[in-house]
Amino acid sequence: MASVPSRLARAWCWLALTLLVAPSLLLAQAVTGVGFHAITIHDPVNGGSMPGYVFYPSAQAKGTTKVGPYDVNAALDAPPIPGAKPLVVISHGNGGSDLGHNDLATYLASHGFVVATLEHPKDNFHDTSGVGHSLVLVGRPIQVKATISALLDDPQWKNLIDAHRIGVAGFSAGGYTSLLLVGAVPRFARFIDYCHRYPNDDAICHDANKITAEARSQGLTLDQWVAKIQGDLTRWGDTADPRVKAAFAMAPLSLIFDQDGIAKIDRPVFLYYGQDDHVLRPTENAARVRPWMKTLVGIKVVPKADHWVFIDPCSAELSKENPVICSDPPGVDRVKVHAQLYTDALAFFRKTLNIPTTP
């Protein structure tokens, strides 16, 4: 039987823990206003800088801010609610934007998360010159790691982030990025194999001729070019990040993984993809690698959906500018898909990052 002093000691420890955790319990359940702030992060891959945003819970009333073609459901530079919160970093797809998933960011922030987005250099809506090169294929996860490090070192943000509760989310090439961060290892020679089998797949193989010409200009065959990228996997350090505890991957580019590479994932993954994805066909991507994921804790296949369903529901302005990424097949309601996706993402990160919630 425990002594009275030891029972009292445990009681005091429990009380102290309760007092420390109580604000987190409230924040995990409450829906708050959201603030966001523009950031600039040093890019260790290209040597320049990366723009992005940080979204965070705020006591300020909800509002909408117009940023380019995006209607962001957050107040610019609103004061944050104090206290350390879990962090999720979102990685966009090829040619994407640091605001392409702002609805997911604001949803998570309204439920107690800090969320960071970044614009990947040489692989964004105004510059895709790095696609097919090490700067992108290897550099992307390094840039996410740099974003995490910068926020944890910044006096403005470090006290708002729980360094032990960090997750990543990503779409398409951003989903690929997320998988690398939790341990996946790509085999880039699979690109060549894929394009031999699907030479008319413009979404994946459209740069093959350009890259072949570039390889020849350097005296390399395409096989040697790909081997060079494979050799660059550790050029900027490990692509995995032990600080990242979980990955939420939406329609991930995964045709360049083999079973051994996927088996190296050692943290929880939630996999989302569209049933009728015509950009990253499921049989060569998500559905193919799904059986190899030993740490898969959730999966959702969106019926009839194509690739672009994972982009936020578009504003009227963005729909006019880019109807391809803003359109869905008949029978697919992007707003409803995202409502479910946000609920799933929140539940996934709460569980895998061990965030306490009230009963």
Which residues make up each language-model segment?
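Short alpha-helix in the alpha/beta-hydrolase fold that links the catalytic acid
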Residues: 267, 281-290, 314
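Acidic catalytic loop of the alpha/beta-hydrolase fold
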Residues: 255, 276-280, 308
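Short substrate-entry loop that stabilizes the transition state in hydrolases
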Residues: 77-85, 90-127, 278-282
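Alpha/beta-hydrolase active-site loop
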Residues: 133-159, 194-210, 214-217, 233
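Short beta-strand/loop motif that positions the catalytic acidic residue
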Residues: 271-273
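Short glycine-enriched nucleophile-adjacent loop
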Residues: 149-152, 175-187
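Domain-level recognition of soluble alpha/beta enzyme cores
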Residues: 29-90, 110, 298
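Cap/lid segment of the alpha/beta-hydrolase catalytic domain
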Residues: 66-69, 95, 99-106, 119-142, ...
